[in-house]
Amino acid sequence: MIMTHCNRFIMLFALLLLSFTAAAHPIEEIETEATDTTILVDGVQVTAVKQGMVLRSEPIASTIVGERAVSRNQISALKNLAEMVPNLHIPDYGSRMTSSIYVRGLGARIDQPVMGMTIDNVPLMQKNAFDMELSDIERVEVLRGPQSTLYGRNTMGGVVNIYTLSPFHYEGARLQLGYSTGNTFRLRASFYEQFNDKWATSVSAYRTTSDGFFKNELTGADTDWEKSDGGRWKLLYRNNKGLRIENTLSFAETKQGGYPYAFLGGRSEGVTNADGYAVTPGQIAYNDSCRYERLTLSDGLTIQYETERYSLTSITSYQFTDDDMHLDNDFTPLDYFTLQQKIKEHVVTEDVIFRSKGDRRYHYLFGLYGFYRDQQMEAPVVFKPAGIDAMIFAAANQATGGRVQMHALANMPLDSEFDSPAYGFAAYHESSLRFGKFEAKAGVRIEHEQVSLDTHGSGTLKYALKVGAMPFPMEQEPVVLETESSYKQDFTEILPKLSLIYRFDENRNLYASFSRGFKAGGFNTQIYSDVLKEMLQAQAMGGAYEEKDIMSYDPEYSWNYELGGHFSCAEGAIRGDFALFMIDCRDQQLTVLADASATGRMMTNAGRTRSLGGEVAMQFKPWRALDIDLSYGYTEATFRHYIDGENDYRGNYVPFAPRHTLSAGLTWTIPTGVKWLGDVVLHGGMKGVGKIYWNEANTVSQPFYTTFNASVRLEHKNYSLDFWGENLSDTEADIFYFESIGNRFVQRGRPRVLGITLSINIQ
């Protein structure tokens, strides 16, 4: 099977190589214009301070989405962008807290992300804040493959660089109003002003409200409602001596429901609650509230000094996150247990980059990076009497054959408090040497990180005991638990990379690269309530708690081998990128249940996985008015060695990572000839993803499925009016699946969505 796929990739690679030859014999010249599609943006744009001037001439698999493409495709969040990028999958489930990212077979549901994210060169350190509203975006760069040498921790799958609009590039005011299915309303407003050739500023704000798409059938309430507000203030300075200063202050507040998980079946099926409501497959029905609230505040200061020979850049940031999650953690009408998780986090980062400039054979880059994080978390879990009897006492009562019966008398609160400071620092370097049409690059990063965890747990269990022929249960002395513990982990990593690129010309090249990726280890705070529960249970039954080594997990490593290229032919009418890759991943981090009775998730390390795959992104412009975009990614990510203590999963597919991603779009621009009307832009597209396995045993899966979208846009330099639709085929698909306390749950994808968006530019 693997050899068959490899042969297909070799054939694809050979066909793509022919495009380089075809460029020597172009077809009839076609008038083209520089467009900001997913392949190419205006050549004057400058990429991140750590990359080259033009990403398509670098040995990197990348996708660039410009301002016009962001607007035309209604991209308002990172998960919308992922649908345009091959081998990138960001499912929209749970709430904005669940920012799970999967790329090239790598990814995880909780804790450390596999991809990094920067906004105006400032790294986002809290994964919970990745899913945010994107407004006034100038362009987005998605770099795939390990970027650990330049970007460090948690970028082994790549990095997403987002750049917001600069008041030096645009002056005026913007207003956007949108309404769509689900009673979803969006309002955005911004103002850009350049005072003189040195100073400029911008202010922007947004508000989003939505009733959502799913209802709780028990209460009749909307489950995935949302209210979000935010704003950004940028102040820029530049002089004619090479100095540039940019400060960006931003905040965002989100309040939402979320977690529309439907019960599929399991041990609770048919069980009725105190009101006689039965747990029924296919229903979203839970009795306690599920909601999420988040407040973020960040300030990023970039100071850059440039000469003809070098540039020196300092990027300093402060980030504050305060979020609060509430869950009916059994997701049923039964009174079992609830969870709250509150996180307050302060982060300070500093990155200093010194790099050479100019047209020279040898270039260099040196960097120093450091961060400090102070995080406090509270995670109280409350087990209710019905939940205690069903989840804790049931097995013990059954084991005695009914001779001894234990029953809960009151709620059992399990309070967990965590203090988790962390710090890290790194030094990195990259050298490049050009000889003829070849350019070789070599880089290395030395990174050290230390993370600590201090825990405090407490709980109280009140119960009654009935033995034999006793006429009634007797209340027992409450079991009281108070415990503290401390953990610490240190990581010191050396992250090298090598690449060689051959440039046929400025638009066509081939490259080969080799690099090491790294994802930090950490602590399993979500499983801590299970530890407390088992401690209380052991005390109540007169036994001893057997401590398990489950509170921490190790870093994840990968060796990445990649062969790819960028091409352009037929006078620029055909442009594209392609890559073949193999990723040998060691200690891959997987989200699992500790055992069948566990209520929380934990991260564990699989022995070894391997990802083989390829991806291609192309743009065709047969004539000026027509654009055709196509991207496809294939990944075969399998376990090479993973035994969970009972089962050997060798050869099985890694769960949650799709095997195929597909995106295709056609845009036709029709000039109306009416000055005040502008152009009519017709767009149609298709997106596909799958097959996705939901567990390590590969017994549950979502087949490959497609959704269709379309829009009609009136586009003028001063305004645009969009009539758009997503999932027009109303495709039903599962986007998330999980099992908990013997039950199975799923979240379906959104139904058909229709909307209208009005944008106004006043210049």
Where are these regions (language model features)?
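Extracytoplasmic beta-strand/coil segments of soluble accessory domains associated
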Residues: 62, 79-122, 138
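Outer-membrane beta-barrel translocator/receptor signature
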Residues: 99, 126, 135-138, 149-217, ...
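Short acidic/polar hinge/loop motifs at secondary-structure boundaries
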Residues: 120-146
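Periplasmic-side early beta-strands and strand-to-turn transitions of outer-membrane beta-barrels
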Residues: 169-170, 178, 190-288, 321-335, ...
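Solvent-exposed loop segments that connect transmembrane elements
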Residues: 215-221, 259-285, 330-337, 380-415, ...
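Membrane-embedded beta-barrel scaffold of Gram-negative outer-membrane proteins
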Residues: 302-327, 509-515, 526, 532-605, ...
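Gram-negative outer-membrane beta-barrel transporters
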Residues: 365, 437, 573-585, 602-695, ...
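C-terminal beta-signal and adjacent terminal beta-strands/loops
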Residues: 687-695, 713-763
